[in-house]
């Protein structure tokens, strides 16, 4: 039994094929395409893959993109299943005012982070709290307490959106290809460093608040296209986990199988 995990963000679709629908399953193949080229999946990326027997995905790019993806899944006559955030599930208690309105990618990433923390917690020890950071078109910074309760989070513009906003709202500034540095001495570096420091500051503030609330230092788990770049400038220890969303989908898929829903 092979399992297909799909993560549709605002810019790209990422997929992973696993040998089973359970945590710790072996990754057989993976890839990513821009949303504009989804129609090529069945003829290119997926053409030579083994036939998956189940799939689960999360999608934040809207119904139209999800339907386009489902058309590609017809290659295998595969019934699509998409995550909707729940009040409780995957080891996470959803503290959002309206739980179903929490972005499914955020919820799935928290499930993946919680699974990772529980695996690394010794017998009889209490899990540590976590800051779950997704660095993409937007940046999300979510707090999970030691009991697995999501207690709140932040949404910020990502690097690209910050730079575009400055380009549109100011005279004489163009989107740069600058570097992140401590003391920028040119406009390109100043813009890139300003965006990076703004995101890093939000994460560090959330870390401080969660530590004050829980009485123990949280772990920061970070994923997304620019995660490695951002982690390098953080003043706090950061674990970059590229598969955080896929790990969450594996846990949720396993729960579906156990409940007889798959």
From Swiss-Prot:
Compartment list: Cytoplasm
Keywords: ATP-binding, Coenzyme A biosynthesis, Cytoplasm, Kinase, Nucleotide-binding, Potassium, Transferase
Cofactor field: NH4(+); K(+)
Pathway(s) annotated for this protein in UniProt: Cofactor biosynthesis; coenzyme A biosynthesis; CoA from (R)-pantothenate: step 1/5
Catalytic activity of the protein: (R)-pantothenate + ATP = (R)-4'-phosphopantothenate + ADP + H(+)
GO molecular function, one term: pantothenate kinase activity
BP GO terms, sorted: coenzyme A biosynthetic process
Cofactor remark: A monovalent cation. Ammonium or potassium.
InterPro entries: ATPase_NBD, Type_III_PanK
Listed GO CC annotations: cytoplasm
Keyword Lyase (UniProt): no
Annotated positions binding ATP: 7-14, 137
Family affiliation: Belongs to the type III pantothenate kinase family.
Classification via HAMAP family: Pantothen_kinase_3
Subunit structure: Homodimer.
Name under which the protein is recorded: Type III pantothenate kinase
Gene: coaX
